[in-house]
A protein has these predicted regions:
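Glycine-rich flavin
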Residues: 2-4, 21-27, 33-169, 197, ...
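Flavin (primarily FAD) cofactor-binding/catalytic cores of flavoenzymes
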Residues: 232-234
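Conserved small/polar residues in nucleotide/adenosyl-binding loops
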Residues: 246-253
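Rossmann-like NAD(P)H-binding beta-loop-alpha module
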Residues: 168-201
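N-terminal Rossmann-like FAD-binding beta1-loop-alpha1 element of flavoenzymes
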Residues: 6-27, 185-190
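Hydrophobic patch in the ABC ATPase nucleotide-binding domain
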Residues: 104, 178, 226
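Beta1/beta-strand and adjacent pyrophosphate-binding region of the FAD-binding site
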Residues: 2-12, 171-176
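Conserved phosphate-binding and hydrolysis motifs of nucleotide-dependent enzymes
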Residues: 10-15, 140, 177-182, 252
Length: 257
C-alpha cells in the first residue's frame, strides 16, 4: 500500500490549491476524484465558467438582429458546444497542473475510509488502498431534488448542472424556485429565446436580498418577458410525448422542448 503525507478527497478549488501548496513544501500528496468530469471543481465544470459563457452567448443573441426560433435553436446549440470546449480545456489544464507534479498522484475513483489512516479508492480497474498521515475531505455537495410527485420519473426535469448539457433550446422553460440560481437561468434562457415561467413557493423572490434589489431584479426580468408566479406550490410533474406539465394547486404550466 502506497503511503502519502496527505490524501485529499475531492479535486475542487480548496483541494487542488492545498495539494499544490503541500507539494511545494515537499509533501507527497494523493488527490482522489470520483469523476473525470470534475477535475478543478464546481466553478470550472458546472458553475461560474459554463454559466457565464452561456450568459455571454445569450446576451449576444438578445442584442443581435431578430431571429426565428429555428435560428435561435441553432445558435443555442453552437453556444453549448462552445461552452463545452472551454470547460474541457480548463479541466484538462487543471488536471495536468497536479498530475504533472512529481510529488502528486491523481486517482480517479470514489474514495472511502477503510481505516482512520487508509482510503480505499474504487476505480474502473478495481479497488486499491492508499495511506495518509493526513486525510482531507473536500467533497463538496450534491443537488437537492425536492420530493415532488413525478419529478424522478420525468424525462424533462433538469438541474442547474444537467440543463447546461441540453442541446435543444426549450420553447417554454418552467423554473421551480426564484432564488439567484433560478433567476440567472431564467434570464439566460429568455435571452436565448425561450419563453420562461418562474414558480416561487414563497411570497417573494430572492428573499435574502434587500427588497429594493429584489424589486429591481424582477422588473428587469419581466421586461425580458419572463413570467412570475409567486406563492405557487408545485404538487406534481407529468410528461406527455412532447411536454412536461408542472401541476400547481390551481394552475398548470407546460415546459416545451
Amino acid at each position: 500500500m502506497k503511503q502519502y503525507d496527505a490524501v485529499i478527497i475531492g479535486f475542487g478549488k480548496a483541494g487542488k490549491t492545498l495539494a499544490a501548496e503541500l507539494a511545494a513544501h515537499d509533501w507527497s500528496v494523493a488527490m482522489v476524484e470520483r469523476s473525470d468530469k470534475m477535475y478543478g471543481g464546481t466553478c470550472i465544470n458546472i458553475g461560474c465558467i459554463p454559466t457565464k459563457a452561456l450568459i455571454h452567448s445569450a446576451g449576444l443573441a438578445a442584442a443581435g438582429h431578430p431571429l426565428t426560433f429555428g435560428q435561435r435553436r441553432d445558435y443555442y446549440r453552437e453556444s453549448v458546444a462552445s461552452k463545452t470546449a472551454l470547460v474541457d480545456l480548463l479541466r484538462d489544464k487543471n488536471y495536468h497542473k497536479l498530475a504533472d507534479n512529481a510529488r502528486i498522484d491523481v486517482y480517479t475513483g470514489e474514495g472511502s475510509f477503510a481505516s482512520p489512516e487508509t482510503v480505499a479508492v474504487k476505480t474502473t480497474q478495481g479497488t486499491q488502498q492508499i495511506g495518509g498521515k493526513y486525510i482531507v475531505i473536500n467533497t463538496g455537495a450534491e443537488t437537492v431534488i425536492p420530493p415532488i410527485e413525478g419529478i424522478a420519473q420525468s424525462r424533462r426535469v433538469y438541474t442547474s448542472t444537467s440543463i447546461m448539457e441540453l442541446e435543444e433550446l426549450p420553447q417554454h422553460l418552467v423554473i421551480v424556485g426564484g432564488g439567484y440560481i433560478g433567476l440567472e437561468f431564467a434570464s439566460m434562457y429568455a435571452s436565448f429565446g425561450s419563453k420562461v415561467t418562474v414558480l416561487e413557493g414563497f411570497a417573494e423572490l430572492i428573499p435574502r436580498e434587500d427588497r429594493d434589489i429584489a424589486a429591481a431584479v424582477r422588473e428587469a426580468l419581466e421586461k425580458k418577458g419572463i413570467e412570475f408566479r409567486i406563492g405557487a406550490r408545485v404538487e406534481s410533474v407529468s410528461d406527455t410525448a412532447a411536454v412536461s406539465y408542472t401541476h400547481l394547486r390551481a394552475h398548470e404550466t407546460g415546459a416545451y422542448l
